[in-house]
Amino acid sequence: MAKKAPRRTAQRILEVTLDLFNRFGEPNVSTTAISAELGISPGNLYYHYPAKDALINTLFDQYEEALNGLLQASDSVHNVEDAWFFLHTLFELIWEYRFLYRDLNDLLSKNRRLETHFQAVLHRKEKAVHTMLEGMQQAHALLPGTETRAALPTTATSMVVVLTYWLSYEYVRDPRHALEPGNAHHALLRGARHVLNLLEPYLEATQRAHLQALAQVYAPTAG
């Protein structure tokens, strides 16, 4: 049992660090604060994670691994209902690691490894969303023709921009409450709806009607 203690301690450090980063923002959380929250010495924290960047990088690695798994589902999206679920699932993961998006520019300016990995993440997101759109067109959920197909790359990029910066927008709207756990449900619904709204001009009539129906269902909470 004793041999497993360091592994449990390391995982507990990550869990508490993620919670503190999400609540207060990474720049506002010191390793001393993390140690105090855990009730361990700074030396014990240093033994497992010798620098704050080590914590950030490990949390990002967890996020990246989970994201890669979710993005693989993009080729299973064939209609608005599938797209809504796919995007909401992505937003749920972004919410779980929301400190990365809340403090994105600051983190990238200080961490070269994070900078290069996040660029790769954006590329994979765009590729996955483009795959989703192609699947929807092949399933006749999107309007046929060269005009729609020509618009897919730009639309995919626009969707990824909203997906990436939606929580920053929520935070600016209400800095004191937007990123609190109790607001997750509404924030994620709003995000999914606004990303899908970018598709509306290209949706086949019944799919457009279904998107509008979804928007009405979630109108009281989706904003």
Language-model regions: role of each:
Residues 2-10:
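Short, Lys/Arg-enriched anionic-surface-contact patches
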Residues 9-16, 155:
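N-terminal positioning helix adjacent to the helix-turn-helix/winged-helix DNA-binding module
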Residues 12, 20-58:
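Helix-turn-helix
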Residues 61-67:
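Short, basic, alpha-helical segments at the C-terminal edge of helix-turn-helix-like DNA-binding modules
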Residues 71-75, 101, 105-108, 140, ...:
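Secondary-structure edge/capping motif, primarily at the C-terminal ends of alpha-helices
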Residues 72-99, 120, 124, 156:
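Hydrophobic alpha-helical connector segments
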Residues 114-141, 150-168, 186-201:
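Amphipathic alpha-helical packing segments from all-alpha helical-bundle domains
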Residues 157, 168-223:
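C-terminal peripheral helix-coil segments that are non-catalytic and often amphipathic
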